[in-house]
Swiss-Prot record:
This is Peptide deformylase. Coiled coil: none annotated. The keyword Membrane does not apply. Belongs to the polypeptide deformylase family. It comes from Thermotoga maritima (strain ATCC 43589 / DSM 3109 / JCM 10099 / NBRC 100826 / MSB8). The lineage of its organism: Bacteria, Thermotogati, Thermotogota, Thermotogae, Thermotogales. Pfam families: Pep_deformylase.
Length: 164
C-alpha cells in the first residue's frame, strides 16, 4: 500500500510525464494503487497522489477497477453539471465542482493497447478529476477564491502534515 500525498506536497503540482514502459513494474504499481484506493474508500487515485509523477490513474465507478494510462480527453460536451467532490489528497474537504457531463477519451491499458470510449455522468466526473491530477490541477483550483478562503484554515492544517 502507498502513502497518500496531501495538499502541500510539491509532487501534486507537477505535470506528470508520459508512461513509456508497459512492464511488470507498472502492473505491480497499479495493483498497489488499486489496493490503496480501496483501503481509503476512494473511487479514483492518480499516480502523483502516491508520489509517482507519471501519467496514469486507477478508478472504479462500480464496474471494477480500471487502469488509465497516458489519457487524453478528445471531446468535452459543453453541457455541465455541478456536484460535490472529495479527494484523498484533501482529507475531509468536499467542494462543489462544475464538470462536463460527457467526455470522449482515449488512453492505454496495462498492455499498452489503446482504448477509446465515451463516458458520462459519474464516470466522466471521476475521469476528469483524476486527469486534472496528472496536470497538477487540484480541486481547490476549480472553486472560487472566496470558497478557497473559507477553506484556508483546513488547507493550512493539511499542508502542515506534509513530510518534507
Amino acid at each position: 500500500m502507498y502513502r497518500i500525498r496531501v495538499f502541500g506536497d510539491p509532487v501534486l503540482r507537477k505535470r506528470a510525464k508520459p508512461v513509456t514502459k508497459f512492464d511488470e513494474n507498472l502492473k505491480k504499481t497499479i495493483e498497489r494503487m488499486i489496493e490503496t484506493m480501496y483501503h481509503y474508500d476512494g473511487v479514483g487515485l492518480a499516480a502523483p497522489q502516491v508520489g509517482i509523477s507519471q501519467r496514469f490513474f486507477v478508478m472504479d465507478v462500480g464496474n471494477g477497477p480500471v487502469a488509465v494510462i497516458n489519457p487524453e480527453i478528445l471531446e468535452i460536451d459543453p453541457e455541465t453539471e455541478v456536484a460535490e467532490e472529495g479527494c484523498l489528497s484533501f482529507p475531509e474537504i468536499f467542494v462543489e465542482i462544475e464538470r462536463s457531463k460527457r467526455i470522449k477519451v482515449k488512453y492505454q491499458n496495462t498492455r499498452g493497447e489503446y482504448v477509446e470510449e465515451e463516458l458520462e455522468g459519474y464516470a466522466a466526473r471521476v475521469f476528469q478529476h483524476e486527469f486534472d491530477h496528472l496536470n497538477g490541477v487540484l480541486i481547490i483550483d476549480r472553486i472560487s477564491p472566496a470558497k478557497r478562503l473559507l477553506l484556508r484554515k483546513k488547507l493550512m492544517d493539511i499542508a502542515r502534515t506534509v513530510k518534507r
